[in-house]
Amino acid sequence: MVKSIIFDFGGVIMTLDHGRAIGRFQQLGLKDAANILDPYTQGGIFGALEVGAASPEQFKSALSEMCGRDISYDECRWGWLGYAKDVPKRNITMLKRLRREGYRLIMLSNTNPYMMSWARSSDFSRGLDDDEPQGAGVEHYFDAIYPSYEVRVMKPDIRFFQHVLSSENINPEETLFVDDGPRNIEVAATTGMRTFLPINGVDWTEPLIHLLNNCKAEKHL
């Protein structure tokens, strides 16, 4: 029986737009953005930011050097937020439903301070939550959040999954991991967690409920 659900952020809760992010960084002057940016796991200074090895200020300085001009904090944030196509209202509704039904909800994400400055603000769900007309940050919808830059490890490193399972003191066999990255799903499954692989931008809410109902039925077999 599933008691806890661990969600990825980008590609699950938030619809990712990798192409738009590339376009924005190219506009900032990063001509090779298409070869530098990755949909799942960043490398170079982008990866250093997401694993907590570089601060936002260090990232800004490095990006300025790569672009050949001074890049501001707001421009860095604008570039990163190119990834955030939208947050479907149905996803917010589903998170609230799952918590009402007693599931412990956890977010585990390869992300960075620029993205989380938006995600943790009321802009995250403004206009999407009828109970929060002014909007609420992502932490309002989860019991715990683990950004890669705070944990200092990125998926698909198994240590990320092990850290969350240990910190939350949850049984992997009673935990469902939801992620749009096949490699992340593959590694997470080795911990004993159940897994669900939705497709970025496709409605996963009803398939998830179907999966959870099947898990409940297994208990009674």
Q: What does each of the following model-derived ranges do?
A:
Residues 2-93, 100-101, 112-116:
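N-terminal helical cap/lid subdomain that shapes the substrate entry/recognition surface
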Residues 23, 93-96, 163, 186:
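Surface-exposed charge patches
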Residues 99-100, 189:
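Anion (oxyanion) recognition and catalysis
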Residues 101-102, 141:
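Structured helix-beta-strand junction loops
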